[in-house]
Amino acid sequence: MNSINANFSQNVSHPEYFFITGLSGIPYSRYFYIFLFCIYIIAVIGNSTVLLIIALDRSLHSPKYIGVFNLALADIGATNALIPNMMRMFVFESQYISYNACLANMFFVFFFSGMQCFILVALSFDRVIAICLPLRYHNIVNNTVMLLMYSAIWAFNAFVIGTLVMLITRLKLCKSNVIKSFFCDHGPVYMLASNDNIINHQLSIVVTVLYVIAPMVIVVLSYVCIFLSLSKITSWKGRFKALKTCASHMMLVGTFFLPVSGAYIAALMFSLPPNDRIISTSLSFVIPPMLNPLIYVLNTAEIKEVIRKVLYKRSALITK
């Protein structure tokens, strides 16, 4: 521990470098990092493909796919904010990160993860209007409205996370320079503070409510409204057809909120060892961005049709 704290002095407001524990001292960590890198490649390729398909095909320039485009963008940002730094620590066997780099890492991880939450809520709004008010859908939801809404979400999210990180700079991080996490997580960094800043504590609670509890409640209430509307449809065929339009979104919600909530509940209830907790939490961050493109490609007829056209054109060019 003395070597870890070599750059650390209690006479300054913060250490020059932090030491991120990551998966320290476990023999199978290399296999986990290889697995993580494979997830990263799949997530980046999958989401980049979704971005290109939506950007290049005008038939997908609709309110629903504006949301999907933003989600793919957030997924790429989230994986790039987290995994490359973890791979750097593994490949170069260097778990140190500078103070400014730590703040940047904290901002981008929370920023893009927060965007994933808010975009899922926005997509649930789209589905509620489509199912509950189908005749008014095109009057309420259009490209202009969705572009303005997503622009506001990006700006609001940047303001909240920027404020959270800015307040961290006001803390005197004099207890240690060891961050017991796999990235510069706000909670472990806050635990290093020698001065108890009530504003930081209160903002942490607000952020938890805003980014975890509120989105889950809104999504649940959205589906309550959807299922109530579906119960009024007399034919089973009509119900199934309407429910099918929500299938992709329900799977996205499940793959995002279930791993995140499961990881934190397991950590609270079962007193997981630090390394097991880090593995479960890190997987909850990276699994959804990998699965989201697969969900939309497999469940959305429009995207499958575009891919089919591209493959057909490519095969036609090859045969010529």
Regions found by a protein language model. Name each.
Residues 1-320:
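Transmembrane helical core of 7TM receptor-like proteins
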